[in-house]
């Protein structure tokens, strides 16, 4: 597993505003989208490209274009939806799939899958999983293995913040027969008794969309 923790003044500034409990949902959504666009630069560093002959107004040349089959962006519902615009802004030609998962509150590292909208065959596709929080790591491991069971061999996970416990769980449990990377804006102190990241930013889904009882 490759872990990339981004270090940039813009990311640090935006992440601080994002964490502030007084930041309204509208601003929170904008910041999530902006942070993901900044993360996308590093996350797509290994994006596969092919030669593309073109003509400029001055002369012919051979440039590059994203290879086919197109990469697929997979937000983990519901909080991952808040990251989607930031990714599609950078890769408008990418396909989008959806994966619905929620934490089993009695067993925090176990997940319940309640929805999916993905191609049956992901062989040869570069997959980008997006989920704001890497807390226990259970969601990320389950989601990645779900993609691998459909043939994926190249998965990049993009999260905003992570806990050391979650990173360790992913390292120990992700299957080895895959190219797997994790890109995050920051790694926090750890998890509290409820498996929330500390200091964290609260429940990302609630702050994006409001609490649903």
UniProtKB/Swiss-Prot annotation:
Superkingdom of the organism of origin: Bacteria
SUPFAM superfamilies membership: PRTase-like
Binding-site list for 5-phospho-alpha-D-ribose 1-diphosphate: 78, 103, 131-139, 203
Listed EC numbers: 2.4.2.9
Keywords of this entry: Allosteric enzyme, Glycosyltransferase, GTP-binding, Magnesium, Nucleotide-binding, Transferase
Record-listed uracil binding positions: 197, 202-204
Record entry for activity regulation: Allosterically activated by GTP.
Pathway: Pyrimidine metabolism; UMP biosynthesis via salvage pathway; UMP from uracil: step 1/1
Listed InterPro entries: PRibTrfase_dom, PRTase-like, Upp_B, UPRTase/APRTase, Ura_phspho_trans
Cofactor: Mg(2+)
GO MF terms, alphabetically ordered: GTP binding; magnesium ion binding; uracil phosphoribosyltransferase activity
A GO BP annotation: UMP salvage
Catalysed reaction, written as an equation: UMP + diphosphate = 5-phospho-alpha-D-ribose 1-diphosphate + uracil
Family statement drawn from the similarity comment of this UniProt entry: Belongs to the UPRTase family.
Record-linked HAMAP family: Upp_B
Name of this protein: Uracil phosphoribosyltransferase
Organism: Bifidobacterium animalis subsp. lactis (strain AD011)
């Amino acid at each position: 597993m490759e872990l990339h923790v981004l270090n940039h003044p813009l990311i640090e500034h935006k992440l601080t505003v994002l964490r502030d409990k007084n930041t309204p949902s509208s601003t929170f959504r904008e910041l999530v989208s902006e942070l993901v666009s900044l993360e996308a630069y590093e996350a797509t560093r290994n994006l596969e490209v092919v030669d593309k002959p073109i003509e400029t107004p001055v002369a012919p040349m051979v440039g590059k274009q994203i290879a086919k089959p197109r990469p697929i962006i997979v937000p983990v519902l519901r909080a991952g939806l808040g990251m989607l615009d930031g990714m599609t802004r950078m890769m408008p030609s990418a396909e989008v799939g959806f994966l619905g998962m929620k934490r089993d509150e009695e067993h925090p590292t176990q997940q319940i899958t309640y929805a999916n909208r993905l191609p049956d065959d992901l062989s040869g596709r570069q997959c980008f999983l997006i989920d704001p929080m890497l807390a226990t790591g259970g969601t990320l491991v389950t989601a990645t293995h779900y993609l691998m069971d459909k043939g994926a061999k190249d998965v990049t996970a993009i999260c905003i913040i992570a806990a050391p416990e979650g990173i360790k769980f992913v390292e120990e449990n992700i299957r080895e027969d895959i190219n797997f990377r994790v890109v995050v804006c920051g790694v926090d102190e750890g998890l509290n008794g409820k498996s929330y990241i500390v200091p964290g930013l609260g429940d990302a889904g609630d702050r994006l969309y409001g609490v649903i009882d």
